[in-house]
Amino acid sequence: MPELLRLEHFGFTYPQQPCPALADVSLTVRQGEFWVLCGASGCGKTTLLRQLKPALRPHGAAEGRILFDGQPLDDLPPHRQAADIGFVLQSPEEQTVTDKVWHELAFGLESLGCDTPSIRRRVAEMASFFGIQDWFHKKVDELSGGQKQLLALASVMVLQPRLLILDEPTSQLDP
């Protein structure tokens, strides 16, 4: 399988902190692989994951390299970063950008410039796949925490990213 993501001796230190949050992290993720990152609360899992989506990176000093598809991640145009790297945050409230469920599903595709027929088809497929048709026309603020988490996941999956990052994706799902 081709290499998709590589970290080489990556480290990160938050501003005004004496110790690094991450030190000498090296790993390779190949297309089609499924990885699980486990560790105690506060050990740096979210800090590491946010390094993989430049728009979500915290401020601080980084060292080492992150390569996506063989090139430095920071050299990828923003359009490719948005399309190829999907990220579902721990808290869906931090991810929601529109007021209606259907528009939340369509927003990313609209932002990437997809044509209307493709948007409608892909949104309908995701709504069906996740079983959210019954609340498709609801306002996002009327949803439960679990429904919001499911919507956040569906909103990223509709983009069909090459790399999908889930930061505690089931933390608020309804039983």
PLM segments and residue spans:
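The feature captures the beta-strand-to-loop junction immediately N-terminal to the Walker
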Residues: 38-40
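Conserved ABC ATPase "signature" region
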Residues: 117-135
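Conserved ABC transporter NBD signature motif
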Residues: 61-72
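Conserved catalytic motifs of ABC-family nucleotide-binding domains
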Residues: 160
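Conserved ABC ATPase signature
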Residues: 139-143, 147
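Catalytic Walker B motif of ABC-type/P-loop ATPase nucleotide-binding domains
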Residues: 164-167
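A short, flexible loop at the N-terminus of ABC-type nucleotide-binding domains that lies
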Residues: 1-7, 12-24, 56-59, 75-77
